[in-house]
Amino acid sequence: MTTGTEQSVSYHFSSEELIRSCPLPTSMFSHKSHNHTSLTIRASKIEPLSAFLKRNKKHLEYGIMENMIEMIGRQLHNLEVEQNKGITSLHLDDITVFHSGPERDTAIYFAITNEANIHEIDDDNELEITTPHDLSKQSTKNIAFYSPEHKEQLSKKVLPYKLHFKSSYYSVGLLCMYCYVSRSSKPDDSEFETLLAPIINTKIYWFLKQVLQEDPSERRYICV
């Protein structure tokens, strides 16, 4: 939720998981409760990722992509390590973009702001899903990015089911592909190399190679 004027707007977090994992700098916090029940962020501009992507002609530059990967990674790491929780998948507008100032060269920050797909990680490193995804309500703008194992479970239409907590890593990889080359599904190996030729052997290239592994246990969220 955003409020305010053109000069300053605010976003209010009410999810304990997202408040505790929030990757935004504390300088942007205008209010934070001691018991992690309320956090308000102040920024020059706040917008959903779909709007930011549209303004950038459906292509994010390398540095912006790197920043987004790092900030989402910080959130996922906090959820996993500090809270023993994970995310099944991401939609495009599960990510919100926060601008520190009105100029184009000011800092841009990214954060997961939808808690709907957060679940406990069990002893087998899995997340249990007990409620259905309402696929009919998904808009073409708010695209979903599902891992192969998640798509398989959705096709079965049976509840409950379980997913490895690294399902989210694959989802982030697909989201990054969409933000860079407007592809919402993983291309085959030869096309992957062609599409990513401008950034081959860079940190983001190797990051995508690691998170887009078919076997969840082989996925690594590393961008160094």
What would you call each of these model-derived segments?
Residues 88-149:
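Activation segment/activation loop of eukaryotic-type protein kinase catalytic domains
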Residues 210-224:
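A conserved short helix/loop substructure at the end of the activation segment
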Residues 73-86:
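Protein kinase catalytic-loop region centered on the HRD/HxD motif
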Residues 23-63:
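Conserved structural core of kinase catalytic domains
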Residues 68-69:
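Activation segment signature within eukaryotic-like protein kinase domains
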Residues 150-165:
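Conserved end of the kinase activation segment
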